[in-house]
Curated annotation (Swiss-Prot):
Pfam family membership, one: Enkurin
Region feature Disordered, mapped onto this chain: 48-92
The keyword Aminoacyl-tRNA synthetase is annotated on this UniProt entry: no
Alphabetized UniProt keyword annotations: Calmodulin-binding, Cell projection, Cilium, Cytoplasm, Cytoskeleton, Flagellum, SH3-binding
Bias type Basic and acidic residues, positions: 61-72
Primary site of residence: cytoplasm
GO biological process: establishment of left/right asymmetry; flagellated sperm motility
Record InterPro entries: Enkurin_dom, Enkurin_domain-protein
Name this protein carries in UniProt: Enkurin
UniProt-annotated location(s): Cytoplasm, Cytoskeleton, Cilium axoneme; Cytoplasm, Cytoskeleton, Flagellum axoneme
Annotated domain remarks: The IQ motif is involved in calmodulin binding.
Length: 256
């Protein structure tokens, strides 16, 4: 019930016909068009769940003997396109035209072995008495990385990352200081304080004049509410005027 009207009324005794409230609008998802487009985009046309529908085999096509055995392709005759290579000569056969190599393979191999550099065995370590061998270089037992030139030096990418973090922190601090400077408290001058005080007093006089113009008899709810509203406004204005008259120095927040 609206507070501006009285709760008691003779019209309340009139019986009213009950009317069925209208149904709310049907819910329609906002993603309907998106889902429809996705289904048309990714769905395979004419695809079904499970095996496809096939024709029922006819009784005339009954199973015959050896019908499911795999049939081999017909054999083709092998045709040689290139002539055969000559066979390897026997040990008893002599070379054609008496051609022989004068190279002494035995002495050549012996000289290569004597003059060649001996292969160094791969360094290994044995961890058990049964002779289990493992690679020594990848085992971590050999001081490999501590002998590097850049061992113990901060990597370049970490230095670059630290500089970026430091620069970002400085920019953030400057941004915070700038916001604090903009939001600093501002002191009202004597002229501004006096202008605000006179404006409050003028507003109080206007509200008080309107309050004095009210009727003597307050016999309705709207009149009571109007009177209460004017009293609250006058009370707030009196409080603000008292604060400004009591304190000579006033600070306000700078909203710029």
């Amino acid at each position: 019930m609206d507070p501006t009207y009285s709760s008691e009324s003779i019209y309340n005794l009139i019986p009213s016909d009950w009317k069925e409230p209208p149904q709310p609008p049907r819910y329609i998802s906002i993603f309907k068009a998106t889902v429809k487009d996705d289904m048309q985009k990714f769905k395979t046309a004419m695809k079904t769940m499970g095996p496809a529908k096939l024709e029922v085999p006819s009784p005339k096509d009954f199973l015959k003997k050896h019908s499911k055995e795999k049939t081999l392709p017909p054999k083709k005759k092998f045709d040689r396109h290139e002539p055969k290579k000559p066979p390897v000569p026997l040990r008893t056969e002599h070379p054609v035209m008496g051609i022989q190599s004068e190279k002494n393979f035995i002495n050549t191999n012996a000289a290569n072995v004597i003059m060649g550099v001996a292969k160094k065995p791969k360094p290994v370590y044995v961890d058990k008495r049964t002779g289990d061998k493992h690679d020594l270089e990848t085992s971590g037992l050999v001081p490999k990385y501590i002998n590097k030139k850049d061992y113990g030096v901060t990597p370049e990418y970490i230095c670059k990352r630290n500089e970026e973090v430091k620069k970002a922190q400085e920019e953030y601090d400057n941004y915070i200081q700038e916001n604090l400077r903009k939001a600093a408290m501002k002191r009202l001058s004597d002229e501004e304080r006096e202008a605000v005080l006179q404006g409050l007093k003028k507003n109080w006089e206007e509200v008080h004049k309107e309050f004095q113009s009210l009727s003597v008899f307050i016999d309705s709810i709207p009149k009571k509410m109007r009177k209460q509203k004017l009293e609250e406004e006058m009370k707030q204005l009196e409080h603000d005027i008292a604060v400004l008259e009591k304190h000579k120095i006033i600070y306000i927040a700078n909203k710029k």
